[in-house]
Amino acid sequence: MATAPVLNQTTNGTISQVIGAVVDVQFPGELPAILTALETENGDTTLVLEVAQHLGENTVRTIAMDGTDGLVRGQEVINTGAQISVPVGPKTLGRIMNVVGEPIDMRGPVGADKANPIHAEAPAFVDQSTDAAILVTGIKVIDLLAPYAKGGKIGLFGGAGVGKTVLIQELINNIAKGHGGVSVFAGVGERTREGNDLYHEFLDAGVIAKNEAGEAISEGSKVALVFGQMNEPPGARARVALSGLTMAEYFRDEEGQDVLFFVDNIFRFTQAGSEVSALLGRIPSAVGYQPTLSTDMGNLQERITSTTKGSITSVQAIYVPADDLTDPAPATSFAHLDATTTLNRAISELGIYPAVDPLDSTSRVLEPRVVGQEHYETARKVQETLQKYKSLQDIIAILGMDELSEEDKLTVARARKIQKFLSQPFHVAEVFTGIPGCFVQIEDTVASFKAVVEGEYDHLPEQAFYMVGGIDDVVEKAKKMAEDA
């Protein structure tokens, strides 16, 4: 009687072809399963390859997690028989790691007790939590018009240079520093300089703990950092978000914590996928993206969720190519998010920072049941006033302000004050602006804007509303302006 062949998952193979970040490996026996990690020596480093396709003729096509310079045909490849795994647990806190969980902060091995595979199933429906509560950010325009949900997914959309990274750093400053739990930051395909700045900022703020000699230590640290930056091959950029998420999932599932998960930038994750996709021989779809765009995004986003054990609140910066929100990459992200904060170049050109578009940003939790009736009505009145002003702008441009009715003139004056009042000095931008940063409590934000839309501050000059915190600061600034005049 014939017996089934035994799967030999640990046969070693040899490299048969190298095409950029894609490496073909031939095996004499059974082929390793898809997503298996293979290892080969490249100089004095170990290169990790992830199996992506079975090509037939005993060959698998793999994606390299680091540079392939120096690889030669016929070189031996070891099959690990397991997926890429990254260290998880308290020992990862205060450390900087790469996509395969190796430390890149020159502080020796991570020494974690456990390593988890980076590919995992999303939590089942029955395990997911449906509670709705607001996460206070201290940023007026966000808390008022597009509040963030605790345990929700938040997207910061914006083109090049409109302030996504500064906004994410301010959110880290306002939320992560005061947050009792842990945070994980995944730097996906962004500038190495920004990652370095962030690390030193965390050290200065005490989010990463230091010993008496001033060196970073894990004990007492609150954040783990995982980087696959712009200079990395596409394999690393396509997987580093999953590595960071795996670390965050451990704190949620095993320790029952409320975790903050920051990703900068989700677009680079998609971009890396499209670079690899072409090398894997897939036919591109719309605008040259990979045909598996929705699947790749879904596999990542569905794992970022809150369960009955703990929560993951995720803040993701999403680059918008050529300021086009209908581009497939940002458009695919929209469906997964609970709140979207859209940054607009036209607003940044007016000198209003954060350059958040108050009419284009949305939130699932902006409803009376969650935020309360007063907050909801104030937010809607603010949006209504700004929308009226927007529709009057064409008339103003052609005929001038004098042709407007008295009521419309009042609407325009209030809208301009609101627009200026939505600006705010940031703690992380203090070195550039010279203005101390402000954290505004949500109650103050709602009360201030309610008073402005009801006309209680119509007598104050609009410049007094620019780059301040609460309404008391506006009154103070107006007084100072009057004295200087």
Swiss-Prot record:
The reaction(s) this protein catalyses: ATP + H2O + 4 H(+)(in) = ADP + phosphate + 5 H(+)(out)
GO cellular-component term (any): plasma membrane
Keyword field: ATP synthesis, ATP-binding, Cell inner membrane, Cell membrane, CF(1), Hydrogen ion transport, Ion transport, Membrane, Nucleotide-binding, Translocase, Transport
Top-level EC class: translocase
Molecular function GO terms recorded: ATP binding; ATP hydrolysis activity; proton-transporting ATP synthase activity, rotational mechanism
UniProt topology in membrane: Peripheral membrane protein
Protein name: ATP synthase subunit beta
Organism from which the protein derives: Erythrobacter litoralis (strain HTCC2594)
Designated gene of the protein: atpD
Membership in a protein family: Belongs to the ATPase alpha/beta chains family.
EC annotation from Swiss-Prot or TrEMBL: 7.1.2.2
SUPFAM superfamilies tied to this protein: C-terminal domain of alpha and beta subunits of F1 ATP synthase (SSF47917), N-terminal domain of alpha and beta subunits of F1 ATP synthase (SSF50615), P-loop containing nucleoside triphosphate hydrolases (SSF52540)
Location of the protein in the cell: Cell inner membrane
